[in-house]
Design a protein with these regions (language model features):
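Bacterial N-terminal signal peptides that target proteins for export
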Residues: 1-7
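Feature for long, exposed domains in two main contexts
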Residues: 9-10, 267
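A cross-kingdom marker for long, charged
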Residues: 246-274
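N-terminal signal peptide c-region/cleavage motif recognized by signal peptidases
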Residues: 14-18
Length: 274
């Protein structure tokens, strides 16, 4: 009798644990630039306030950085780290690939999707591989309409409250950055080696991208998506920023479209079971 009761209690505990198990989802999104409209009356000359950058998760930055590192390993000169001192001492051109380097800022235009290895787990939030996308046909549809896709990505994530859910940092499109300036100073130590003789200091403005912003997805009975995306564009000699800010309640499995005079977003949140 005790054995039967113990088994019943164990079964109840397993059932309770299963009922309260954390659900996982995957989101896929495409962001694209809208066609210029000469009838547009909205004024984007006022620069929007900086976004609240709390609880940030830089999935895309890490993914694009891995993409740049792979290009370096494949022999791309743009992404190779030049070893100036080794070149002087050996008389030969030398370069290396450092997995800890910042390869993202070496892109003039970011790829449409970051290159990541396909994963299947529920350990932490991670990016989708291109083979796990469902929206490839929509990219072609946008291009046929003359629209320019800036980013096609997705990630898997557990259900979290509004307070705990991270803000996923979004970057895409071409780079907007001021040119670098350099100053060279000679070290005072007369016994310095060649590699330490000169101190080259780089003064560089922060790199910005055509598409930047944050997306947060949290669960409270329903799925809620908070979208704050900035699109930079050229207006004569000026660079303007148009912001899309939307808060949307969505259902898993439905395809949703966020509209803005300068920017469009298509996304779908799907249930994920490993």
């Amino acid at each position: 009798m005790k054995t039967i009761k113990s088994l019943a209690i164990l079964a109840a505990l397993i059932s309770s644990t299963s009922a309260h198990a954390t659900r996982w989802f995957e989101v896929e999104m495409i962001a694209f630039e809208q066609e210029p409209s000469f009838s547009l009356r909205e004024d984007f000359s006022i620069e929007p306030e900086p976004l609240n950058r709390k609880n940030i998760k830089s999935l895309l930055f890490d993914g694009f950085n891995t993409t740049g590192y792979k290009l370096c390993l494949e022999g791309s000169e743009r992404f190779a780290e030049q070893d100036f001192i080794r070149g002087l001492t050996s008389g030969a051109h030398s370069s290396s690939c450092n997995p800890d380097a910042n390869y993202v800022e070496k892109f003039d235009t970011l790829p449409l999707s970051p290159q990541v290895e396909p994963q299947e787990h529920m350990d932490s939030i991670y990016l989708l591989n291109e083979s796990q996308f469902n929206f490839s046909n929509k990219i072609n549809e946008l291009k046929r309409k003359g629209l320019k896709p800036l980013l096609h990505t997705g990630w898997r994530f557990p259900e979290q409250s509004n307070k705990r859910a991270p803000n996923i940092e979004i970057i895409g499109g071409k780079q907007f950055a001021s040119p670098s300036s350099y100053s060279v100073t000679e070290n005072d130590d007369q016994f310095s080696s060649l590699s330490k003789r000169f101190n080259i200091q780089e003064s560089k403005e922060q790199v910005h991208w055509q598409l930047e912003g944050l997306i947060k997805i949290h669960v409270r009975h329903y799925l809620y998506v908070t979208t704050d995306l900035d699109l930079k564009y050229e207006d004569g000699n000026d660079i303007r920023t148009a912001r899309m800010s939307q808060y949307t309640r969505v259902y898993s499995g439905d395809i949703h479209y966020l509209d803005h005079p300068k920017l469009g977003v298509i996304f779908q949140i799907r249930k994920y079971k490993h």
